[in-house]
Every structure is written in structure tokens, then in C-alpha cells.
Amino acid sequence: MVDATEVRWRDTGSLGAFCDFEGKRRFPELGINLNVLQPGQPMGLYHRENAQEDFLVLAGTCLLIVEGEERELKTWDFFHSPPQTEHVIVGAGTERAVVLAVGSRGRGRKGLVYPVSEAALKHGAGVEQETTKPADAYGSFAEWKRSLYQEGWLPDR
């Protein structure tokens, strides 16, 4: 058992902050992240992959871009992304958002694609040229830094 306010976080700068609950070794079958997004911050870049992912908004408002269409997500809204579904989540509204993200692992990076999406580009969450390489997709972003939990990232208990 761990307390999210006491474990290692990563500050990704313009892509928000997240806690993955893992130490030096990744969980082999399931990835789970607690993401904190300010308005306008994407959780990552618009993509599709061979694994399913699920997202639950715990606080705030987000913009979901799925298959090129924009939809609002509010507190307690859940989004299931089947394999090969193009998607990204962006913080929206006037306050920070907290999103729990869960995804299956074990299939490697095969099938990961960052396609071009006008909707995602409009929100700073897309690539200008399709790629299958995360290093190319995220090349213009600052390197992620290890961080301690910052007071106010998560809702009060």
C-alpha cells in the first residue's frame, strides 16, 4: 500500500504531472497513473496503440479527443479506449483536473502510432507528421523530471 502524496511523481512540464505508483521496476501487466493537468495541458499526444486504456476523471473537467472528435469529460466520467482507438485527454475548464489512467501492458510498443489530427493540434496535443517513434513525437517537449508531490495537486481528503 502506498499514499499517492508520498510516492515519486514526474513533472512533465507542459504535459502535466503524474504518479505511476511504481518504484524502479514497472508492473509487468498493468500500468496505472494518476495524472494532474492544468487547463490546456494534454496528458500526452494523440495516439493509438495495440493495448486498451481506461480513464476516470476524479476531479475537474477535461477535453477528450477521440477518433478526431471533441467531447467533454467531467468528474466521474469514464472513457474506455479499445485497442487501436485514436485518443488524447487535455485539461479543460478553469481548474486543474485529476485523471486516473489504467492500461494493459505486455505487447511492447508495436502498434503505437501518433497520427496527425487537426483537433489534437488545435489543443497542442498532436503531431504535425505521423510517426511510430515516441522520441520523434515528444522530441520538442522538455525532459520529464522526478518530483515530489506538490500540495494542491490532488483534491482534499
What residues fall within each predicted segment?
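A generic structural signal for short beta-strands and their flanking turns/coil linkers
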Residues: P28-N33, A51-E53, G60, P83-T85, ...
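A short, N-terminal "cap"/entry segment at the start of jelly-roll beta-barrel domains
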Residues: M1-E29, E118-R157
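A short beta-to-alpha transition loop/helix N-cap that caps and shapes the active-site region
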Residues: R107-V113, H123
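Short, conserved beta-strand element in jelly-roll/cupin
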Residues: L34-P39, H47-I65, V102-R105
